[in-house]
């Protein structure tokens, strides 16, 4: 184990692909996010819309996992899940959360923090029916999410049973326990890797409706 730690201590790289200056960023953080996000999409990265979602329960215990961004507007950032999942339980107890996008090949990272609320049932249903058929079925049978299951075979059997039951049914109803959340941002941080660990970090803080940009120590 000591050899592994020693090896890890020697692993490092220099970041030299970009710079981040106050005079060059958009005055609104969502517009700045869209610039970086679109660049990530155009760079053909693997799932640039994947993001880490950090939540915390009322005892202060954090939980983090990777989810997919399914909507991004000035009103907020959307993701979908089982309401009875750990993230759903956490958000019912403590609605504050953070998102983290990390694009290593671009040497960029974005943090977005704020309060999370459920989106409308209409929006959730509309998105659910846009999902592939198999994904719709999976949403029905993978509950309670994070619950213990005996083995993979049991999960597959559940899927197969519902698949046979619905057959060619054109419309599969959205489960009541499944839907979307929207994070309304009040904080952003944009990180650009730089040489010698002197990274560029710019934060946006919403103060009385105005976004204030500040440079942070690396």
UniProtKB/Swiss-Prot annotation:
Enzyme class: oxidoreductase
GO molecular function: FMN binding; pyridoxamine phosphate oxidase activity
Catalytic activity: pyridoxamine 5'-phosphate + O2 + H2O = pyridoxal 5'-phosphate + H2O2 + NH4(+); pyridoxine 5'-phosphate + O2 = pyridoxal 5'-phosphate + H2O2
A single GO BP: pyridoxine biosynthetic process
Annotated metabolic or biological route of this protein: Cofactor metabolism; pyridoxal 5'-phosphate salvage; pyridoxal 5'-phosphate from pyridoxamine 5'-phosphate: step 1/1; Cofactor metabolism; pyridoxal 5'-phosphate salvage; pyridoxal 5'-phosphate from pyridoxine 5'-phosphate: step 1/1
Source superkingdom: Bacteria
Binding sites annotated in the UniProt record for substrate: 12-15, 70, 127, 131, 135, 197-199
InterPro entries on file: Pyridox_Oxase, Pyridox_Oxase_CS, Pyridox_Oxase_N, Pyridoxamine_oxidase_dimer_C, Split_barrel_FMN-bd
UniProt keyword annotations, A-Z: Flavoprotein, FMN, Oxidoreductase, Pyridoxine biosynthesis
Pfam families xrefs: PNP_phzG_C (PF10590), PNPOx_N (PF01243)
EC number: 1.4.3.5
Cofactor(s), by name: FMN
Cofactor binding remark: Binds 1 FMN per subunit.
Annotated FMN binding sites: 65-70, 80-81, 87, 109, 145-146, 191, 201
Function: Catalyzes the oxidation of either pyridoxine 5'-phosphate (PNP) or pyridoxamine 5'-phosphate (PMP) into pyridoxal 5'-phosphate (PLP).
Quaternary assembly: Homodimer.
Family recorded in the similarity comment: Belongs to the pyridoxamine 5'-phosphate oxidase family.
Protein name: Pyridoxine/pyridoxamine 5'-phosphate oxidase
Organism: Acinetobacter baylyi (strain ATCC 33305 / BD413 / ADP1)
Phylogenetic classification of the source organism: Bacteria, Pseudomonadati, Pseudomonadota, Gammaproteobacteria, Moraxellales
